[in-house]
């Protein structure tokens, strides 16, 4: 009987905890977004600073790009215009906010599915500058980094 790949199990654990929790460090990304309404999602602490909504789109974009790297599939594209920091929708209402939250969740689930389907040997394969494993750990820590920003923005907004 083949041994389960411990690295992939640990990676999925980190990936899941950074997005949904529970995590010893506190709130995961999805938890930090709980209860955010449109006005709060659009609020900026200053000119040229990102708002929560932009952080959500940025996180979704990079989940998509990491999936593209892992799958080596140039057909994997983000469904919104712009790269790195996709533009906000033209209408920034509650329905659009809900759609973009769903986009973040969908990109997370698609990336998770891609990680689950990877052969253990694929973890050491290059996916751009970094290995598959480094890309996947990187996106989990990317979530945590932006979770901290979102929590800070929420405190400043109040």
Region spans (language model):
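Acidic/histidine-rich alpha-helical segments that form the ligand environment
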Residues: 86-124, 134-139
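Short, contiguous alpha-helical
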Residues: 2-33, 38-87, 124-158
């Amino acid at each position: 009987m083949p041994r389960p790949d411990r690295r992939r199990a640990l990676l999925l654990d980190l990936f899941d905890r950074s997005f949904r929790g529970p995590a010893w460090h506190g709130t995961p990304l999805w938890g930090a977004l709980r209860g955010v309404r449109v006005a709060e999602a659009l609020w900026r602490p200053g000119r040229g600073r990102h708002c929560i909504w932009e952080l959500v789109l940025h996180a979704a974009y990079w989940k998509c790009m990491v999936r593209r790297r892992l799958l080596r599939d140039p057909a994997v594209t983000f469904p919104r215009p712009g790269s790195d920091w996709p533009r906000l929708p033209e209408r920034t209402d509650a329905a659009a906010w809900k759609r973009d939250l769903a986009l973040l969740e969908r990109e997370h689930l698609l990336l998770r599915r891609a990680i689950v389907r990877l052969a253990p040997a694929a973890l050491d394969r290059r996916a751009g500058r970094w290995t598959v494993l480094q890309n996947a750990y990187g996106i989990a820590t990317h979530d945590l980094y932006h979770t901290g920003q979102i929590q800070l923005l929420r405190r400043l907004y109040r």
